[in-house]
């Protein structure tokens, strides 16, 4: 088979996988809207209560699951290229913790209860600060994979310590907000909160279109510059985009870990690392994973609803350990 035929075959495989993932997402979305404490049949007319349940509760929650999953997966894929580390992930590297810490600071320092817009801005600033710290240390100190993970874990522990301190100075309402962020949950998502989504979606689409630029960056800064990439400008734009996505995701659903690690890594293993296809596929796969996880979170127990962050950690942590062992064996 000639080179152009191989390339055409690979592109056809990417597109077929993208269509399959989209179909799976649509099926899971339909299932998501039907199942719950009250089953909504697609073959019968809905009562006024069922219609309100569908439109005001399940539909905004479904949209939240999809946009958060897509944002985290695409952020993880981009961060892995930016840091040159396949184990990079917003939750593991402490960036999500930085976003939650900034939201806690806003919660306690502002004289009134912050609006979703204020929480979103605080989360974006927190994510940006922690991303800059991590990228700056990685570049200045030439950190290895293990050391970069340790720095990320340390940043996460630091932010977690401050958030834990906040427990002891919070009233009942603030305590519920803190628990919501720490465990990761979209149970409180409503259309009012989707102002955050209006900010997130354009950035997500823009980042998904940066695949060719990321492919050039993977060749190294020198080769990327020779191919016409303004490396410095592109790097800062990517950092800002990642911070906005992570900040919005944390503001909407709290800290949800491992989506940005597991999804891009498994897709790279299965289909290769061509980012112009990997990024859109990561978005659909991340959305699919979070919708699937939230279905289980809502239905696994009869008496209670599990936090979404617990479900993604249960799925992602064993895969992360396997990836660490595999990375060690490769070296």
UniProtKB/Swiss-Prot annotation:
SUPFAM superfamilies: ABC transporter involved in vitamin B12 uptake, BtuC (SSF81345). InterPro entries: ABC_BtuC-like (IPR037294), ABC_transptr_BtuC (IPR023691), ABC_transptr_permease_BtuC (IPR000522). It is found in: Cell inner membrane. One of its GO terms (biological process) is cobalamin transport. The chain crosses the membrane at residues 20-42, 62-84, 91-113, 117-136, 148-170, 190-209, 240-262, 277-296, 303-325. Gene3D superfamilies: ABC transporter involved in vitamin B12 uptake, BtuC. One of its GO terms (molecular function) is vitamin transmembrane transporter activity. Keywords: Cell inner membrane, Cell membrane, Membrane, Transmembrane, Transmembrane helix, Transport. One of its GO terms (cellular component) is plasma membrane. Pfam families: FecCD (PF01032). The keyword Membrane applies. It is a multi-pass membrane protein. The complex is composed of two ATP-binding proteins (BtuD), two transmembrane proteins (BtuC) and a solute-binding protein (BtuF). Belongs to the binding-protein-dependent transport system permease family. FecCD subfamily. Part of the ABC transporter complex BtuCDF involved in vitamin B12 import. Involved in the translocation of the substrate across the membrane. This is Vitamin B12 import system permease protein BtuC.
